[in-house]
Amino acid sequence: MLKTILPTIMLIPLAWLTSNNMVWINTTLYSFAISLTSLHLLHQPLDNSLNLSPEFFLDSLSTPLLILTIWLLPLMLIASQSHLSSGSTFQKKSYITTIILLQVSLIMTFAATDLILLYIMFETTLIPTMIIITRWGNQLERLNAGSYFLFYTLVGSLPLLVTLMLIQNTLGSLNLMMLPYLAKSINNLWSTNMLWLTCIMAFMVKMPLYGLHLWLPKAHVEAPIAGSMVLAAILLKLGGYGMLRITILLDPLTTHMYYPFLMLSLWGMVMTSSICLRQTDMKSLIAYSSVSHMALVIIAIMLQTPWSFMGALALMIAHGLTSSMLFCLANSNYERIHSRTMILARGLQTLLPLMATWWLLASLINMAPPPTINLIGELLIITTSFSWSNLTIFPMGLNVLITTMYTLHMMTTTQRGKTSHHAKSIKPSFTRENTLMTLHLLPLLLLSLNPNIIL
């Protein structure tokens, strides 16, 4: 793991010591080199001692999420260049440093061996994310969004710390590799369901569960492009990863406690998809669609079958890349017309035909057609939920229908129709942007052709 963590940390002195005109090129190239060298981690042989240490370990669950995190760093740097082009050199280097610190804390979260270390790094990700939102956001409302993000996350997470300390005293260890063997001895000791709630709620807020999701649209809308990308692609997946890890401990209790959360997720999935139909703001629409997709992941994790876990992992990876790509496309529109309102971006297909192709591909993948990895994830989850209860097919089917409707609505509103007057003298699409979209699409294409890479 140090082969990944140390080179990532060394990007910070690289950013500060590089000459001003080379800072973006050097950091992007070196971070891309790190992401390429980390791909060998996907090969997980049975004798996996190379990826084990007392502090860090990798398995088939954490590796895909870890590689997604590392892959996204150069993409965030490529996407942010235009946003910071008018800023001072100090601002640019501070921004890059904040992103790299966030990256390191995310890598350590996904690789943590101990639940306490996982909790500490889980909370550490909050600080750089909030700095990115409140310092480099566009509107004044970013301060409000930052405080929402901070308080929702902290209020959800603090009971988890107390519970983990209690479990540590009861079991004597919080090592993730020991938990399956230790958990059997504590079933009779847990007479209350509050422990289950405190353990799960921190991750439910991060997912977010419908009803606890109000921080997400605010944070997405006010964050700069790198903030939106990392929020959608990775920070939401921290909640899913934490739930997958901690349900090993809570196994017998989950089957008694999951009904309200399953109902809320099924209802919230349809509701947030319906909210998307009423959105005029591009970033807000993509943010609400993230809540809808993550509700599917919550359902999968609660049902606790091998198929549902595979579906949850596939959908998390697929959604991470798809939503990040959609945010990049929304940002490319915003940089040209200086508005996130969809109706003001109408008719861009005639002005930016290549960008319209990226919009079409991203919209299609968001709708999960065959043979994409999105469809594989959704099919696994829908099949599992149908075997749990036949009635779930109605909200699931309705969600698929509404998802198609709002995605097509977003696509046609921004690309078709008569071009608005202020959009006629816009800049053409840059090679930087086309490279960015290609780097989002390549992993999706690879995973669609061979899902066994992560499943």
From Swiss-Prot:
Biological process terms in GO annotation: electron transport coupled proton transport; mitochondrial electron transport, NADH to ubiquinone; mitochondrial respiratory chain complex I assembly
Keywords of the record: Electron transport, Extinct organism protein, Membrane, Mitochondrion, Mitochondrion inner membrane, NAD, Respiratory chain, Translocase, Transmembrane, Transmembrane helix, Transport, Ubiquinone
Catalyzed reactions per annotation: a ubiquinone + NADH + 5 H(+)(in) = a ubiquinol + NAD(+) + 4 H(+)(out)
GO CC, one annotated term: mitochondrial inner membrane
Disulphide-bonded residues: none
One Pfam short name: Oxidored_q5_N
Gene Ontology molecular-function annotations: NADH dehydrogenase (ubiquinone) activity; ubiquinone binding
Primary localization class, coarse: mitochondrion
EC number of this enzyme: 7.1.1.2
Membrane topology summary: Multi-pass membrane protein
Organism superkingdom: Eukaryota
Transmembrane segments: 21-43, 60-80, 99-119, 147-167, 195-215, 224-244, 257-277, 284-303, 308-330, 351-371, 375-395
Subcellular localization, as worded in the UniProt entry: Mitochondrion inner membrane
Primary role: Core subunit of the mitochondrial membrane respiratory chain NADH dehydrogenase (Complex I) which catalyzes electron transfer from NADH through the respiratory chain, using ubiquinone as an electron acceptor. Essential for the catalytic activity and assembly of complex I.
Family: Belongs to the complex I subunit 4 family.
Subunit structure: Core subunit of respiratory chain NADH dehydrogenase (Complex I) which is composed of 45 different subunits.
Protein name: NADH-ubiquinone oxidoreductase chain 4
Gene coding for it: MT-ND4
